[in-house]
Amino acid sequence: MAQINVIGKNGGRTIDLELPEVNAAILHDVVTWQLASRRRGTASTKTRAQVSKSGKKMYSQKGTGNARHGDRGVPTFVGGGVAFGPKPRSYGYTLPRKVRQLGLAMALADRQDGGKLIAVDGFDLDGKTKSFVSWAAQNGLDGSERVLIVTDDAQTRQSARNVAWATVLPVAGLNAYDILRHDRLVIDAVALEPAQEEVEQ
């Protein structure tokens, strides 16, 4: 059981969150699955049937003294088709739901163990970039680290969206990959409840 400190304008409190021990292999599986799902898979090459070449045999089979060849579209010639080249496809695959949930919980645990998790009881920002920068400075965020902010508050998202070192995600978009690729995690306390439910299922 992890105790997470929550900061707020009316003082602090703690939240008890059941987090597992970090397992690098499971985190690797989840991150690899996420990255595979994000791949566009648009790489495409033309086969010998698709290149703009005549299908006519270059010269007769015998009598020229040259090597025997068919048409000019074969992969052995410059400008010919590609043998076994890539075609558009999906690189995504299925990962068990419990493994995905465990990966998210372990990513949260990793940030909590390293003292890189900040939970907030309402940001109380006015939508201005200046107000976010001021709030961040008061809470030890000076721009030297990349910060992931998870909240559904529209004013907070507007305040932070123009800050180069901050990334804002909605609560529903919380995922292991984005947590791990940022140095710090700043999360709205209300987002920890659905995260706990996700872990416990």
UniProtKB/Swiss-Prot annotation:
The keyword Ribosomal protein applies. InterPro entries: Ribosomal_uL4, Ribosomal_uL4-like, Ribosomal_uL4_dom_sf. Keywords: Ribonucleoprotein, Ribosomal protein, RNA-binding, rRNA-binding. The keyword Oxidoreductase does not apply. Residues 39-72 are annotated as: Disordered. GO terms for cellular component: ribonucleoprotein complex; ribosome. SUPFAM superfamilies: Ribosomal protein L4. It holds the Pfam family Ribosomal_L4. One of its GO terms (molecular function) is rRNA binding. Residues 42-53 have a biased composition (Polar residues). It comes from the Bacteria. GO terms for biological process: translation. NCBIfam families: rplD_bact. Belongs to the universal ribosomal protein uL4 family. One of the primary rRNA binding proteins, this protein initially binds near the 5'-end of the 23S rRNA. It is important during the early stages of 50S assembly. It makes multiple contacts with different domains of the 23S rRNA in the assembled 50S subunit and ribosome. Forms part of the polypeptide exit tunnel. Part of the 50S ribosomal subunit. This is Large ribosomal subunit protein uL4. It comes from Deinococcus deserti (strain DSM 17065 / CIP 109153 / LMG 22923 / VCD115). The lineage of its organism: Bacteria, Thermotogati, Deinococcota, Deinococci, Deinococcales.
